[in-house]
UniProtKB/Swiss-Prot annotation:
Enzyme class, UniProt record, top EC level: transferase
Membrane topology according to the record: Multi-pass membrane protein
Keywords: Cell membrane, Lipid biosynthesis, Lipid metabolism, Magnesium, Membrane, Phospholipid biosynthesis, Phospholipid metabolism, Transferase, Transmembrane, Transmembrane helix
Family annotation (InterPro entries): DGGGP_synth, Prenyltransferase_related, UbiA_prenyltransferase, UbiA_sf
Pathway field: Membrane lipid metabolism; glycerophospholipid metabolism
GO cellular component, one term: plasma membrane
Record family assignment: Belongs to the UbiA prenyltransferase family. DGGGP synthase subfamily.
Function: Prenyltransferase that catalyzes the transfer of the geranylgeranyl moiety of geranylgeranyl diphosphate (GGPP) to the C2 hydroxyl of (S)-3-O-geranylgeranylglyceryl phosphate (GGGP). This reaction is the second ether-bond-formation step in the biosynthesis of archaeal membrane lipids.
GO biological processes: glycerophospholipid biosynthetic process
Name used for this protein in its record: Digeranylgeranylglyceryl phosphate synthase
Compartment(s) of residence: Cell membrane
Length: 276
């Protein structure tokens, strides 16, 4: 067993990014920074929950990761599967204890999100499109969690919609990237059932819906600061163009990475709109 595997299996960069998005969601909702204690708790609840979700996901994905992600801790033998299971439960417990310290609404949403993560990894992930929707919903809930924690919605509701839509696109394109390993496991993802080209159409559709939804805050009389979203929309459209043109593994990887980047950039754009 490698001690570094306890950090590596959580995919810390993703978790820290999720924590930042949760915190930024609270700022977008309020229009200013929350009190330091609440800000720290929001960041920790989202970060630790994401770590637990990634760990339990690797526990259930052991066989498929032997093909798609052999470098990860479980396939390469750096951590035992049972250890990973217990570790994920510990992370979830710590996250919920921290959520309880915020308010009852943050605790309830935390319970819903954590349970959903477990059920997704256990049963929902192989289901065509259902798994994509669940992951996208969890991503959309990340900035929304920050808003719930400060008991104010503001622009965070619009941000959650955009985060959900762009993540549906990203998850479908990720399935195109991982189609070889998914077929070996017997998973029934959208690209396997419909073919990569049709799946690409679905991904592109949700990318376009994201761009359309990104203009919803204009209805709320948001100031000129919201124009920061325009470059993000262009990035989303470029990612959609790439996967529409070519569904090879390398292209799908690049497209979904660009969409992942767009999520964080969208949060920053909404942040600018909220405080300007």
């Amino acid at each position: 067993m490698e001690l570094k595997a306890f950090i590596e299996i959580t995919r810390p960069h993703n978790c820290i990014l999720a924590g930042i998005v949760g915190l930024l969601g609270s700022i977008v909702a309020l229009g200013h920074f929350p009190d330091p204690k609440t800000a720290l708790l929001i960041f920790l609840v989202v970060t630790v929950g994401c770590a637990g979700g990634n760990t339990i996901n690797d526990y259930f994905d052991y066989e498929i990761d032997k093909i798609n992600r052999p470098e990860r801790p479980l396939p390469r033998g750096a951590m035992g599967r049972k250890v990973a299971l217990y570790y994920s439960m510990l992370l979830f417990a710590v996250g919920l204890a921290l959520a309880y310290m915020i308010n009852i609404y943050a605790f309830i949403l935390g319970v819903i999100a954590y349970v959903t993560m477990f059920i997704y990894a256990w049963k929902l992930k192989p289901l065509p499109f259902v798994g994509n929707i669940v992951v996208a919903g969890l991503t959309g809930a990340t900035p929304l969690y920050g808003a719930v924690a400060v008991e104010h919605l503001g622009l965070a509701g619009y941000l959650a919609i955009c985060a959900f839509l762009v993540n549906v696109a990203r998850e479908v394109i990720k399935d195109i990237e991982d189609v070889e390993g998914d077929m070996a496991k017997g998973a029934k993802t959208l690209p396997i059932i419909w073919g990569k080209k049709r799946a690409a159409y679905v991904g592109v559709l949700f990318a376009l819906l994201t761009v359309i939804a990104s203009f919803l805050p204009v209805k709320a009389s948001v100031g000129v600061g919201y124009y920061a979203m325009v470059p993000v929309d262009l990035l989303i459209l470029y990612a959609a163009y790439l996967i529409l043109r070519n569904q090879d593994r390398e292209v799908a990887h690049k497209s979904q990475k660009l969409l992942k980047m767009s999520i964080f950039l969208a949060v920053m754009a909404f942040l600018i709109a909220a405080i300007v």
